A protein has these predicted regions:
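Extracytoplasmic cell-surface/polysaccharide-interacting catalytic and binding patches
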Residues: 1-76, 88-191, 200-228
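Conserved metal-phosphate-binding beta-hairpin within the catalytic cores
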Residues: 197
Length: 228
């Protein structure tokens, strides 16, 4: 078995907006954030968003494409250490919906997926002139009450959407995928979540997931609390 490669701290990029090119909104640092469905702060109040440098480059180029069309990329989450993943799985809403933790999972166990490697990013768009978020049909992190009832509105295959919503989702996909091509990367738009873009599992599985213990104290993310 080939050992996983360790991601160097130097390979993590602070997504600080890059002089207004995009906006970072650390949803999980605030228990009261309207888009934080978990009911507790998964991250410290002063947490920032980080991405692996290769995905950060994709986001920067996607943001440039969006800006040329009068839109702003809105980054919601990136690196999600294993401790934060554990808090997610222990949250009241996850315990209410144990099916979310069963494959095909909506909430990954600690260490699984692109987020604990900084190789997945959650994004949306807003109009630069009006400051209004584009209608994507659902909010960010909209999970189904019944996962087994069929395709739900946040899923990319859900078709009972207005033409405007379909166009907005296609616009976001276009910016992110063109950004990836520019950087020589291959990006997976996660089927179940219109906001999630990541490297393919064949790529992310080569790297060890990140724990807060792997990070310098000043950039650690996870909140020292419980969601129970």
């Amino acid at each position: 078995m080939v050992a996983m490669k360790k991601i160097a701290v130097e390979d993590l990029v602070h997504m600080d907006g890059h002089n207004g090119l995009y906006v970072a909104d650390v949803v999980y640092a605030d228990a009261a954030h309207p888009e934080n469905v978990f009911g507790c702060a998964l991250y410290r109040a002063d947490a920032q968003i980080y991405l692996h440098k290769r995905l950060a480059d994709v986001v920067l180029h996607a943001a440039e494409l969006a800006q040329k069309d009068g839109f702003v990329l809105w980054v919601k989450d990136g690196l999600r250490p294993m401790e934060a993943q554990k808090l997610m799985g222990e949250s009241p809403i996850a315990q209410k919906h144990p099916e979310w933790l069963v494959a095909p999972r909506l909430i990954s166990p600690p260490g699984a997926g692109g987020h604990p490697r900084g190789m997945a990013v959650d994004v949306t768009l807003y109009d630069q002139e009006t400051g209004v978020e584009l209608d994507m049909g659902t909010p960010f992190d909209c999970f189904p009450e019944d996962k087994d009832a069929g395709i739900w509105p946040a899923h990319r295959d859900y078709m009972d959407l207005s033409d405007a919503v379909k166009a907005n989702r296609a616009r976001l996909d276009d910016y992110m995928l063109r950004g990836a091509v520019f950087c020589g990367e291959t990006l997976l738009p996660l089927p179940a979540e219109w906001w999630d873009f990541r490297f393919y599992p064949e790529e992310t599985s080569l790297y060890a997931p990140i724990s807060d213990a792997d990070l310098p104290p000043e950039i650690r993310l996870s909140a020292n609390n419980s969601c129970i």
